[in-house]
């Protein structure tokens, strides 16, 4: 979606290009001028299987298969899978407190849409693809659905989606909100548009105190003149009920490890280059003994790419399980991470060894399996901080220290057991955040 990112933020172009500072008027003009090109771009994405060809009109605010449910409709925007989990956790708590509410969840990705279909079948939830931020497309969307309130999850902030919602005088909330330091700097280069966008919500639920400060600065608030509440509630991605798993799959992996007398090393939520790095590191270790290295990529469609790098291995998506003398196994499915966490002797949490920003550490910490991560953890900085201090997570900064840390972590000690117990308690407490956030949200909506 590089073209859309440039429209959203022209300062994301390569260094050396003339910097372009957006005003609201110029932003709208860019969308209107580039609208036909963006339409063409979306149809190209259909060929790449990155868009649903049967629902492509939803990206233009039209062609919805579902009708607006009667009664109160709360709109939650969750761009992709991670935000989608936070949205579902929030919906579950809001539904407990307000049984007559209905929920519309918009997403940007097919994977997130499939996750909603799988997990919300018996909930008052409707899914739609996010309209792109062309002023007319957003207007069509709001006119069709007529939401009674809007909640934007995490860090996907689109100017027209936010400001047009604000113009309709709807309660507008940013929840589980965070923004990277580099993104903050880019927004600061466009102060007119940033201030109007970030001062629009009446409530911001930030993930930590640093994020609270970022949002207050972008909104142009100083101490004593804030027109909105910015409250720290933490990330909303995890809940205790997510500790359920595919028991048969989990037990099959444990039985394999028992029969093979090997340790299970799980490379979880990995991104490009990380599988190769972890495989090479583990293969050089002489003190680990027999092991099974399971790859559970963040995006399972990368399975062919991983096999081309590391060679043939059994695949979960084909109904296969590890066989004697297998060193690698590819768990290329969605919705089975908890079973993998439970079966593993150690978790190497991906998205943290290059520049992806890391993934939610709360979910694996719930299972009590020790975790290793890399240096790139800015997306969940506060949660990593407390879990690193507890000792259930260990952080490495090179392949050399990764290998050493794997060996040390597999040698369970009483100190590590205490760290795991402490980390599990922290993770369980974090899973209660959606309850706290729901109270703030209901109070704002019903004000």
Region spans (language model):
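Nucleotide-activated sugar donor-binding and catalytic core shared by glycosyltransferases
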Residues: 2-7, 13-447
């Amino acid at each position: 979606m590089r073209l859309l990112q440039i429209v959203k933020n022209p300062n994301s172009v390569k260094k050396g290009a003339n910097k372009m500072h957006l005003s609201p008027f110029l932003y709208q003009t860019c969308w209107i001028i580039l609208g036909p090109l963006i339409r063409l771009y979306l149809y190209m994405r259909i060929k790449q299987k990155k868009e649903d060809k049967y629902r492509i009109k939803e990206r233009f605010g039209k062609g919805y298969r579902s009708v607006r449910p009667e009664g109160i409709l709360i709109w939650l925007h969750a761009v992709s899978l991670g935000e989608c989990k936070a949205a579902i956790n929030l919906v579950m708590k809001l539904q407990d407190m307000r049984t007559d509410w209905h929920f519309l969840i918009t997403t940007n990705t097919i994977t997130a849409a499939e996750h909603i279909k799988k997990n919300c079948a018996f909930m008052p939830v409707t899914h739609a693809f996010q309209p792109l931020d062309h002023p007319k497309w957003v207007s069509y969307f709001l006119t069709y659905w007529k939401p009674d309130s809007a909640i934007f999850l995490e860090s996907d902030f689109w100017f027209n989606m936010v400001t047009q919602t604000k113009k309709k005088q709807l309660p507008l909330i940013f929840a589980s909100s965070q923004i990277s330091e580099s993104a903050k700097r880019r927004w600061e280069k466009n102060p007119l548009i940033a201030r109007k966008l970030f001062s629009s919500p009446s409530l911001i639920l930030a993930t930590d105190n640093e994020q609270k400060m970022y949002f207050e600065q972008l909104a142009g608030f100083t101490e004593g003149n804030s027109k909105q509440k910015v409250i720290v509630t933490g990330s909303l991605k995890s809940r205790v009920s997510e500790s359920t798993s595919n028991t048969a799959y989990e037990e099959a992996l444990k039985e394999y490890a028992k029969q093979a007398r090997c340790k299970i090393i799980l490379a979880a939520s990995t991104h490009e280059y990380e599988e190769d790095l972890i495989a090479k590191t583990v293969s050089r270790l002489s003190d680990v003994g027999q092991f099974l290295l399971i790859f559970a990529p963040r995006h399972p469609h990368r399975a062919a790419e991983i096999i081309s790098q590391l060679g043939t291995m059994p695949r979960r998506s084909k109904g296969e399980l590890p066989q004697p003398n297998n060193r690698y196994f590819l768990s290329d499915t969605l919705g089975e991470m908890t079973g993998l966490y439970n079966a593993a002797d150690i978790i190497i949490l991906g998205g943290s060894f290059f520049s992806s920003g890391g993934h939610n550490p709360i979910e694996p910490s719930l299972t009590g399996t020790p975790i290793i991560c890399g240096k790139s953890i800015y997306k969940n900085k506060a949660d990593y901080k407390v879990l690193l201090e507890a000792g259930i997570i260990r952080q490495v900064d090179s392949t050399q220290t990764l290998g050493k840390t794997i060996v040390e972590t597999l040698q369970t000690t009483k100190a590590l057991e205490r760290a795991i117990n402490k980390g599990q308690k922290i993770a369980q407490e974090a899973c209660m955040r959606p309850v706290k956030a729901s109270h703030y949200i209901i109070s704002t909506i019903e004000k």
